[in-house]
UniProtKB/Swiss-Prot annotation:
Keywords: DNA-binding, Nucleus, Repeat, Transcription, Transcription regulation. One of its GO terms (cellular component) is nucleus. It comes from Arabidopsis thaliana (Mouse-ear cress). Residues 68-114 are annotated as: Disordered. Residues 78-89 have a biased composition (Basic and acidic residues). This is B3 domain-containing protein REM11. PROSITE patterns: B3. InterPro entries: B3_DNA-bd (IPR003340), DNA-bd_pseudobarrel_sf (IPR015300), REM_fam (IPR039218). The lineage of its organism: Eukaryota, Viridiplantae, Streptophyta, Embryophyta, Tracheophyta. Its main location: nucleus. PANTHER family: B3 DOMAIN-CONTAINING PROTEIN REM-LIKE 1-RELATED (PTHR31674:SF41), B3 DOMAIN-CONTAINING PROTEIN REM-LIKE 3-RELATED (PTHR31674). It is found in: Nucleus. It comes from the Eukaryota.
Length: 286
């Protein structure tokens, strides 16, 4: 549907002026109506040839001036103008609907070609941390086929390994990382309140007779030497660390109680650790 807005003057190559109707379609396109065919005929324009109109001002009045012609060979433009033509208008720009469909198609193609790559990455913000555990979105879990709960492997920037536990959180498929994720953040320089990204790696390692899921942190790495000893079992180095942090020994929680204090949890409300003035040698050996 279209309606006339005004009359505009068309100027030929020889300066001849013709009037044409300026029409606006309901999609917002501006079109030339009656009059433009006379300009085409008088200036030798034929079907299949493109032409350019320049907007000029003459005494403050806008006009469209024919400035150039250029031959084209589009087979789809072989139709001649006739008196019985259903439409006597030509759009000044391509159809908006066609442009939108083409743009949408291009976006879908790009999304399909890169979806496999995008699904491997998940970015975490402080809002994804609840009660000292890290929530993994269900979309990320489903896209990568992560189905088994239990121990998984986290890989740092320098390929050092941390072990964490995958826990079930809700019926919508969301899972969470328990103890272990704080260590990789601490060692790779992720500070409190900073977002960080993990990449899923389709690499299966066999440990304890079962496959593990591997992740890779895409943030800058730092020295992990001070935390390397924490990956070992309960030993003197681990107890030394607990003593320095003024924490109780909790064999169920393990490493999480140490790393929790540094950045990622509220010290007063987190249930994963309890401060104590000093650990006696008797308690350490118990």
């Amino acid at each position: 549907m279209a309606w006339n807005l005004a009359i505009i003057t068309l100027v030929g190559k020889d300066g001849t002026k013709l009037e044409a109707t300026l029409r606006r379609e309901n999609r917002g396109l501006m079109c030339l109506g009656n009059g433009w065919k006379d300009l085409s005929i008088s200036n030798g324009l034929k079907s299949g040839k493109s032409f350019t109109l320049e907007l000029i001002l003459e005494n403050g009045t806008p006009m469209l001036s024919l400035v150039s012609t250029q031959s084209t060979s589009h087979k789809s433009q072989k139709r001649e103008c006739s008196k019985h033509s259903e439409k006597e208008s030509i759009s000044a720009v391509p159809s908006k609907g066609k442009k939108n469909r083409k743009a949408r198609s291009n976006r879908e193609e790009r999304r399909d070609s890169s979806s496999a790559i995008q699904n491997r990455f998940v970015t975490f913000t402080p809002e994804d941390i609840r009660d000292c555990i890290l929530i993994l979105p269900s979309q990320f879990i489903k896209a990568n086929g992560i189905n088994n709960l239990g121990e998984i492997t986290l890989l740092g920037q320098n390929r050092m390994k941390w072990f964490a536990y995958l826990l079930s959180m809700s019926k919508d498929g969301s899972l969470a990382l328990g103890s272990g994720w704080k260590g990789i953040c601490e060692a790779n320089g992720v500070n409190t309140g900073e977002a960080f990204t993990l990449e899923y790696i389709d690499e299966q390692e066999t440990a304890h007779g079962r496959a593990q899921v591997c992740f890779y942190g895409v943030f800058p790495g730092k020295s992990v030497r001070s935390f390397a000893s924490l990956r070992s079992k309960w030993n003197d180095l681990f107890y030394d660390f607990l003593r320095e942090q003024n924490l109780r020994v909790n064999p169920i929680i393990g490493v999480a109680i140490c790393l929790c204090k540094h950045h990622y949890c509220n010290y007063n409300s987190c249930s994963l650790f309890k401060p104590r003035p000093k650990l006696s040698q008797k308690n350490l050996n118990s």
